[in-house]
Regions:
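Non-catalytic terminal and boundary segments that flank Rossmann-like NAD(P)-dependent oxidoreductase
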Residues: 1-42, 274
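Conserved glycine-rich Rossmann-like NAD(P)H-binding loop of the short-chain dehydrogenase/reductase
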Residues: 61-78
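Catalytic loop of short-chain dehydrogenase/reductase
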Residues: 117-137, 145, 159-209
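C-terminal helical subdomain
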Residues: 6-8, 18-24, 209, 216, ...
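N-terminal Rossmann NAD(P)H-binding glycine-rich loop of SDR-like oxidoreductase domains
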Residues: 49-59
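Hydrophobic structural elements of the Rossmann-like NAD(P)H-binding subdomain
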Residues: 112, 164, 214-217, 227
């Protein structure tokens, strides 16, 4: 068995090395990405009304996929969607019933669990926000289980379907010593992403016998409203426009197979991240 090659936890160093070695996979996703493979696929994207979710949906539309966008309140302001289902709060069981009802029996080829929440204020042990921590875990981790469970129990996920868990490198316990040295510590964010990673791994194990493949993905460092509190380090750490991040995610979706699933993938370079 070949040795696993992991991504570098030191993001400034990782980005510098990518430039030094002219890593096309990391620096020019267009050089490896074949979006035509997504043509005709029915894809459901949660949290598709802004940020990375919007960018992923737009990329899929450009590749002629049939995109179903869900959102909690404000509807997407772009065109080309196959369907929009609003009122989908991933923390609400009744919203899951509505989601299934509004899908009207439509089977899903690819489910992208993207809906998330990131508290703006930074957390330390001196100023924890317990309510916000629980909220982040409920949305980012339990929410992904709610959506996947609702679709699976309604038989809208089938053999050959793919489930993508959008999480974060922030959920890697192994990387905390490097990435959180000196803070910020952001307990809620990191706990919610670690929980999402665990949920994704368990889903991958449980759904594989049904022919449904699950992958856990860190989408890379993207310039969105959710990461704006880190904008001072965007450039040194290689943050990209969300449109580029979307292509990275879609490229990794194409690579999901019976031989490559249930992994924690850094969409930035295609390498694994340790749990």
């Amino acid at each position: 068995m070949s040795e696993i090659k992991f991504s570098d936890p030191n993001q400034p160093q990782r980005f510098a090395n990518q430039k030094k070695t002219n890593d096309k996979r990391a620096l020019d996703i267009e050089s490896v990405y074949d979006g035509e493979k997504l043509s005709g696929k029915v894809v459901l994207v949660t949290g598709a009304n802004r940020g990375l979710g919007e960018a992923i949906a737009k990329e899929l539309i450009s590749q002629k996929a049939k995109v179903i966008a869900t959102c909690r309140s404000s509807k997407p302001k772009y065109e080309g969607l196959h369907k929009v289902i609003d009122g989908i709060d991933v923390t609400d069981k009744k919203a899951m019933d509505k989601l299934v009802k509004d899908l009207e029996g439509q089977e899903i080829d690819i489910l992208i669990n993207n809906a998330g929440y990131f508290m703006v204020e930074k957390e330390t042990i001196e100023n924890p926000n317990f309510d916000e921590e629980v909220k982040m875990i409920d949305i980012c981790a339990v929410g992904q289980i709610r959506v996947t469970s609702a679709l699976f129990n309604a038989k809208l996920l089938k053999k050959g379907s793919k489930v993508v868990q959008i999480t974060s490198q922030g959920g890697s316990i192994a990387w905390r010593t490097t990435q959180n040295a000196g803070g910020p510590f952001d307990y809620g964010h990191h706990m919610s992403k670690a929980a999402a990673n665990m949920a994704g791994k368990l889903l991958a194990i449980e759904l594989a016998p049904h022919g449904i493949l699950v992958q856990i993905m860190h989408p890379g460092f993207n310039k969105t409203d959710m990461t704006k509190k880190y904008e001072k380090i965007w450039e040194v750490e290689g943050a990209v426009d969300a449109s580029v991040g979307a292509k990275r995610v879609c490229h990794e979706i194409n690579l999901i197979s019976p031989e490559r699933y249930g992994l924690f993938i850094n969409c930035e370079d295609g390498l694994q991240i340790p749990w």
